[in-house]
Regions:
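Conserved, structured C-terminal
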Residues: 1-194
Length: 194
C-alpha cells in the first residue's frame, strides 16, 4: 500500500528500541509486486476464467480474505478487498508479470464492459461510498463516532490507544464542530471540493 514505507520505518524503530535483542532483518518487497485492482459488480465474472486454484465465490472468499493460486498461469496472491465500496479484488503478481496479467484481465473484461481507472477515480468512488481516509477527511477533532466507526472502539477493554483523547472535555462538548455529508437536490450537480 501507499503506507508500506511508514510501516517499515515503524517496525525498524521498534526493533531498535523495543526488541534490540531480536536477531531480525526487515526487507521491503513492495517493488517486487505488481498490484491490479479489479472492482465492480462483475469482477468475479472477469477474473473467474483466468484464476486457477481459487474459489472466488462469496462463501469461499469473503470480504477481507486472501488466497494464493494462479492467474493466467502466474503465481498470485489474491485479496478480496475493495477501496471503492464495490465488490472487488486485488491481484498481486510478481512485478515482471504485471503488464501481461493486466492486459489479460483487460481483454477478459471487454465482454463485461471493463474500464481502466486511476487513483483519482478510485478516491472519488471511495468517498462516494463513505470510505474515509483517517488524516485526509479527518483530523484530531473527529471521533470514531463522528464518522460511523464507533463500533471499532474497544469499550469492553480497560484501556486502548486513543482512550484519553476521546475523554477530553473538548471532544465531548455538544457545540463542537461536526463532520457531515452533503447531498445536492439535483444528483447530477457535483459539489466542488473544499
Amino acid at each position: 500500500t501507499g503506507g508500506a514505507s511508514r510501516v517499515l520505518a515503524i517496525m525498524e524503530d521498534y526493533i531498535q528500541t523495543e526488541w534490540p535483542d531480536l536477531d531480525v532483518w526487515l526487507t521491503s518487497t513492495t517493488e517486487e509486486w505488481a498490484v491490479i485492482a479489479v472492482q465492480g459488480p462483475l469482477s468475479r465474472e472477469v477474473l473467474g476464467p483466468l484464476v486457477e486454484g481459487i474459489d472466488l465465490s462469496r462463501e469461499a472468499m469473503p470480504h477481507m480474505s486472501a488466497r494464493e493460486g494462479k492467474i493466467c498461469g502466474v503465481p498470485t496472491r489474491l485479496f478480496r478487498v475493495s477501496f471503492t465500496g464495490e465488490l472487488g479484488f486485488e491481484v498481486n503478481v510478481p512485478a515482471g508479470y504485471g503488464r501481461a496479467v493486466w492486459e489479460a484481465i483487460y481483454t477478459a473484461g471487454q465482454a463485461h464492459g471493463i474500464t481502466p481507472y486511476g487513483t483519482e477515480t478510485m478516491h472519488v468512488l471511495r468517498a462516494e461510498k463513505g470510505f474515509i481516509i483517517v488524516g485526509q477527511e479527518t483530523d484530531g477533532t473527529v471521533t470514531p463516532d463522528d464518522c460511523g466507526l464507533g463500533w471499532a472502539i474497544g469499550e469492553a477493554k480497560k484501556d486502548f490507544v486513543g482512550k484519553r483523547s476521546l475523554a477530553r472535555p473538548a471532544m465531548m462538548a455538544s457545540d463542537r464542530k461536526q463532520l457531515v455529508g452533503l447531498l445536492t437536490v439535483d444528483p447530477k450537480t457535483v459539489l466542488e471540493e473544499g
